[in-house]
């Protein structure tokens, strides 16, 4: 499978690296902040940070997911404002990363900082059938902790 990545800024590939897998076992590629100057997020503040890239997934059989970087969330309280970003196969615009500072201190994003992770995943578009009844299961309608601790 080929993922095409287009640089939308002259900084990409020079000052800011193209997304790549850091190790042979990596599931995600890092996305970097493509900004001209540092951006500070106050505690509780949200900001859309550009990456300077667009991608082309080969077909509707694939989507790209944008996840928070674990270190930012654990160490600084900086997460994605929408939980997980979904990039559909037909989207060709710039990838933007919505960040929110849930920590108690301001957090500064520097140009080129790794701010999120991109994962390409297979997609199944099922045939949707409206049903009067659903098959019974042992679990039934139990949710929100119903299967134990």
Locate the predicted segments by residue:
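DUTPase catalytic domain/fold
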Residues: 1-149
């Amino acid at each position: 499978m080929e993922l095409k990545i287009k640089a939308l800024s002259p900084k990409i590939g020079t000052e800011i690296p193209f997304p790549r897998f850091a190790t042979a076992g990596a599931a995600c590629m890092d996305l970097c902040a493509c900004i001209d100057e540092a951006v500070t997020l106050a505690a509780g503040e949200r900001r859309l940070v550009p990456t300077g890239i667009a991608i082309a997934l080969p077909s509707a059989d694939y989507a790209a997911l944008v996840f928070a970087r674990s270190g930012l969330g654990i160490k600084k309280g900086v997460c994605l404002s929408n939980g997980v970003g979904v990039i559909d196969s037909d989207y060709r615009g710039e990838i933007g990363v919505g960040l929110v500072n849930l920590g108690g201190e301001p957090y500064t994003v520097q140009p080129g900082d790794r701010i999120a992770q991109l994962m390409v995943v297979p997609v199944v578009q099922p045939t949707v059938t409206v049903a009067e009844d659903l098959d019974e299961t042992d679990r039934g309608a139990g949710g929100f902790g119903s299967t134990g601790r």
